[in-house]
């Protein structure tokens, strides 16, 4: 298995610190708001990484933090007249609601900054004693130029960073590049006692202290979004290696940005989507499927047409599963000649593994799922009202592969009673089938609009309205919702 390592800028053969065991840390959200689509991508992707490592037989210790002490939280709490820590806890609860909807499994540990202040103070104190950090008026700063390897993750030189430093430099710093490890207390902000007076930790030191506490030095995988490479992860390396004298992380993994209609997602452009708003319009399995449909290091563009295309693809997989479930209920007759072969399914399984072994290429892995759907459909069509014992075993193998691939990709939730994949919503719920039919109808309407056949397009819209389905034509594509 190979992983692209941001630190070395190449794919490397994966060799964990301990054979058979993987320790991984992923930077979690700063909990001052509901999570947005950009937060959801690393959330879903690194959940998939963890799932695949377990599938490969590794024991995985997965840690994902919550930053519940931060300037953004303090500012938001002041706006709302709330306590910063209480506000952060509330949004942590909302985070789990969105994560659960996207079928993201809980980490083994979810450390909070506010519960690890002694660990953070201890690490800052160690850096001060080693001469890597200095104290000014109750603030503690890391002295960047004393760490020889600074810039090795981002590929930036000190000269480049110096040129890009802001004009307004904190006069308390010895160098504009130095960053805060501990911030002196300000009125109205949460603070804790420390050897340098009351204050709170800086952002970067939090992740270092918590990851080192639970995973130790030179742990296996540290993940996060591409935007965290600099300064956050660069600073994590500097302070961690200065404190311990040991390599911090073996493999650094970073996912690409999400764009909306090929523009960067931002509040100012009005294209900033919260996960829960998206989940109000699209089923969670489709959102997860879409997020995994592109290689994690590539940008992922979100728009209505791409979601509709992903929806059509997902419906093909659902249809194949429905056919398999139905075929496996047919009677077995030994008088029926076997017509199916296991070989194509073995090849598909190998191609899925090869895709995931190649830097967790979920896009190619999903391609293998489509191959499985096509081959399963062919096998079902070849069999009759009764199937041979051999063919039934092959059909069951096809279903087992769907389950195996889903255990890695996590697209569908699993019914605890039957073990079936929940492809149509909750057990006994046909909402998924209804949604698929509506999307097919909308596809026909879209084709009519392209032909400028407005009469047909309007007739479809009016017919759906009579059934309680309202359509909204937007620049991102057509959206629908149930009336009332």
Swiss-Prot record:
* Pfam families the record matches: CysS_C, DALR_2, tRNA-synt_1e
Which locations, inside or outside the cell, does it occupy?
A: Cytoplasm
Motif placement: 'KMSKS' region: 264-268
Gene Ontology cellular-component terms for this entry are: cytosol
Question: Where is the motif ('HIGH' region)?
Answer: 29-39
What are the alphabetically sorted keywords of the record?
Answer: Aminoacyl-tRNA synthetase, ATP-binding, Cytoplasm, Ligase, Metal-binding, Nucleotide-binding, Protein biosynthesis, Zinc
Task: Give the GO terms filed under biological process for this record.
Answer: cysteinyl-tRNA aminoacylation
Q: Which reaction does this chain catalyze?
A: tRNA(Cys) + L-cysteine + ATP = L-cysteinyl-tRNA(Cys) + AMP + diphosphate
What is the superkingdom listed in this entry's lineage?
A: Bacteria
User: Per its Swiss-Prot or TrEMBL entry, what cofactor is needed?
Assistant: Zn(2+)
- Name the InterPro entries for this protein: Cys-tRNA-ligase, Cys-tRNA-synt_Ia_DALR, Cys-tRNA/MSH_ligase, CysS_C, Rossmann-like_a/b/a_fold, tRNA-synt_1_cat_dom, tRNAsynth_Ia_anticodon-bd
Q: What class of enzyme is it?
A: ligase
Residues bound to Zn(2+): 27, 207, 232, 236
Q: What is its EC number?
A: 6.1.1.16
| Free-text comment on the cofactor | Binds 1 zinc ion per subunit.
Q: Name one GO molecular function term.
A: ATP binding
Which Cys pairs does UniProt list as disulfide-bonded?
A: none
Annotated positions binding ATP: 267
Q: How does it assemble?
A: Monomer.
| Family the UniProt entry places it in | Belongs to the class-I aminoacyl-tRNA synthetase family.
According to UniProt, the name of this protein is Cysteine--tRNA ligase
């Amino acid at each position: 298995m190979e992983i692209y390592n941001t630190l070395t800028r190449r794919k490397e053969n994966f060799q964990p610190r301990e054979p058979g065991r993987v320790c991984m840390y992923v930077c979690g959200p700063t909990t001052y708001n509901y999570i947005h689509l950009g937060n959801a991508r690393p959330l879903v992707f690194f959940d998939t990484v963890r799932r695949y490592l377990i599938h490969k037989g590794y024991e995985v210790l997965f840690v994902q933090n919550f930053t519940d002490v931060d300037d953004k939280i303090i500012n938001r709490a002041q706006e709302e007249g709330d306590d910063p820590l209480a506000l952060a806890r509330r949004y942590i609860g909302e985070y789990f609601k969105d994560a659960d909807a996207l079928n993201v499994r809980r980490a083994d540990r979810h450390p909070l900054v506010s519960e690890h202040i002694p660990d953070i103070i201890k690490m800052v104190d160690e850096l001060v004693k080693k001469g890597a950090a200095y104290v000014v008026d109750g603030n503690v700063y890391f002295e960047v130029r004393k760490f020889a390897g600074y810039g090795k993750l981002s590929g930036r030189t000190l000269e480049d960073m110096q040129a890009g430093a802001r004009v307004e430099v904190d006069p308390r710093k010895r160098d504009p590049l130095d960053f805060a490890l501990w911030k002196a207390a300000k009125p109205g902000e949460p603070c804790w006692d420390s050897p340098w007076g009351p204050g709170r930790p800086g952002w970067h030191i939090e992740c270092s202290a918590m990851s080192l506490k639970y995973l130790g030095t030179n742990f296996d995988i540290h993940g996060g979004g591409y935007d965290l490479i600099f300064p956050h992860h660069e600073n994590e390396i500097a302070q961690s290696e200065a404190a311990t004298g040991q390599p911090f992380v073996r493999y650094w993994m970073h996912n690409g940005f999400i764009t909306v209609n090929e523009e960067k997602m931002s509040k100012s452009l009005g294209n900033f989507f919260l996960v829960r708003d998206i989940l109000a319009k699209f089923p969670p399995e489709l959102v997860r499927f879409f997020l995994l449909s592109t290689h994690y290091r590539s940008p992922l563009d979100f728009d209505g047409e791409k979601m509709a295309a992903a929806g059509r693809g997902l419906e093909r997989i659902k249809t194949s599963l429905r056919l398999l479930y139905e075929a496996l209920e047919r009677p077995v007759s030994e008088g029926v000649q076997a017509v199916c072969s296991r070989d194509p399914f073995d090849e598909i399984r190998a191609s899925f593994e090869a895709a995931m072994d190649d830097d967790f290429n979920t896009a190619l892995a999903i391609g293998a799922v489509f191959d499985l759907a096509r081959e399963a459909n062919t096998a079902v069509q070849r069999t009759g009202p009764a199937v041979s014992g051999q063919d039934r075993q092959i059909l069951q193998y096809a279903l087992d592969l769907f389950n195996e691939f889903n255990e890695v990709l996590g697209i569908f939730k699993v019914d605890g009673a039957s073990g079936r994949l929940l492809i149509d919503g909750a057990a006994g719920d046909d909402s998924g089938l209804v949604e698929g039919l509506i999307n097919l109808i909308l596809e026909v309407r879209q084709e009519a609009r392209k032909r400028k056949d407005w009469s047909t397009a309007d007739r479809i819209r009016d017919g759906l309205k009579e059934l309680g389905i309202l359509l909204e034509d937007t620049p991102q594509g057509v959206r629908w919702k149930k009336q009332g």
